[in-house]
């Protein structure tokens, strides 16, 4: 593994609702780089002008959510000509937008739970009838399960929409799939082992992701080996369809009949002690430090 990365900025913090998670991810990445002799420096774009990045040779993006994961920072780095980790402008923008990701996947034949765009003047009862109950309501452009709620009873969609709309004007309602939550990490051109997520809460929300210690992460995931390999190949293809590159994560659900549905793509996954890509990497013998260096090795412009 090469170490001549030059001066590296670790982008962390930022202005999104996922700032605290990003600070944790960035601190872990920064420590790993420094342990391996990399000249790495923390850089919080909420506190410093982006023009100050001009003195850096590479950027490790540990930002999550708006401005860091949606193509905004990627576009700035493209203009500055500084190689950065993860996906480019288009894939970051599409991947952040759950609605457009699902539209693209559906057009390409990727199976995803049925969904509807919800607006203030939607026929809420008709959407409930079409998708069935329970259903999930999500802001299209938030991560870490911010603003998500589960509608269990008829007539509950309007209130769930109002909650989600506080986070983003674009809101989707999504069919409930109840057989289990899973994720596939992507590193370079390969999919990592599938991880099954078993939250103690009703679903894998912000609390389960970052604050609780009783969420179970199962790897091996319990799926038949041939099915797991099939899903890994499909996850890699789903990642590529949105233009993903470098590294990322693709989440999927299983229904009770054993059918899988791809849920969303994450182009800048978490790197905290609760995070999933490091778990998948560990399962193939790749430690956290080696994972961080591998991601930085894949930094690019264009």
Curated annotation (Swiss-Prot):
Mg(2+) 2 binds at residues 264, 266. The keyword Cell wall biogenesis/degradation applies. InterPro entries: ATP-grasp, ATP_grasp_subdomain_1, D-Ala_lig_Van_CS, D_ala_D_ala, Dala_Dala_lig_C, Dala_Dala_lig_N, PreATP-grasp_dom_sf. Pathway: Cell wall biogenesis; peptidoglycan biosynthesis. Residues 102-297 form the ATP-grasp domain. GO terms for cellular component: cytosol. Its cofactor is Mg(2+); Mn(2+). Its EC number is 6.3.2.4. The keyword Transport does not apply. Keywords: ATP-binding, Cell shape, Cell wall biogenesis/degradation, Cytoplasm, Ligase, Magnesium, Manganese, Metal-binding, Nucleotide-binding, Peptidoglycan synthesis. Mg(2+) 1 binds at residues 251, 264. GO terms for biological process: cell wall organization; peptidoglycan biosynthetic process; regulation of cell shape. PANTHER family: D-ALANINE--D-ALANINE LIGASE, D-ALANINE--D-ALANINE LIGASE B. NCBIfam families: D_ala_D_alaTIGR, PRK01372.1. Belongs to the D-alanine--D-alanine ligase family. Cell wall formation. This is D-alanine--D-alanine ligase.
């Amino acid at each position: 593994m090469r170490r001549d990365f030059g001066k590296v900025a670790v982008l962390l913090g930022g202005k999104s609702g996922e700032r605290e998670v990003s600070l944790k991810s960035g601190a872990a990445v920064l420590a790993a780089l420094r342990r391996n002799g990399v000249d790495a420096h923390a850089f919080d774009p909420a506190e410093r002008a982006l023009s100050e990045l001009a003195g850096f040779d590479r950027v490790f993006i540990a930002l999550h959510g708006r401005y860091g994961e949606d193509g905004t920072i990627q576009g700035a780095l493209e203009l500055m000509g500084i190689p950065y980790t993860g996906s480019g402008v288009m894939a970051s923008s599409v991947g952040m937008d759950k609605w457009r990701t699902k539209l693209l996947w559906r057009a390409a034949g990727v199976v995803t739970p049925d969904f509807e765009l919800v607006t203030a003047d939607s026929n809420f009862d008709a959407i409930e009838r079409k998708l069935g109950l329970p259903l999930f309501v999500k802001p299209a452009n938030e991560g870490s399960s911010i603003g998500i709620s589960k509608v269990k009873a008829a007539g509950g969609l309007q209130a769930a929409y109002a909650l989600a709309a506080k986070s983003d004007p674009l809101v989707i309602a999504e069919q409930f799939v109840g057989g289990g939550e899973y994720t596939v990490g992507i590193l370079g051109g390969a999919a990592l082992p599938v991880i099954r997520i078993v939250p103690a809460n009703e679903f894998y929300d912000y609390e389960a992701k970052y604050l609780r210690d009783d969420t179970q992460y199962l790897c091996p995931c319990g799926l038949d080996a041939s099915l797991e390999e099939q899903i890994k190949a499909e996850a890699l293809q789903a990642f590529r369809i949105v233009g993903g590159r470098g590294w990322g994560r693709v989440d999927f659900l299983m229904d009770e009949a054993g059918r899988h549905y791809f849920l969303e793509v994450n182009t800048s996954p978490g790197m905290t002690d609760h995070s999933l890509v490091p778990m998948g990497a560990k399962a193939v013998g790749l430690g956290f430090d080696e994972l961080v260096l591998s991601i930085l090795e894949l930094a690019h412009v264009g």
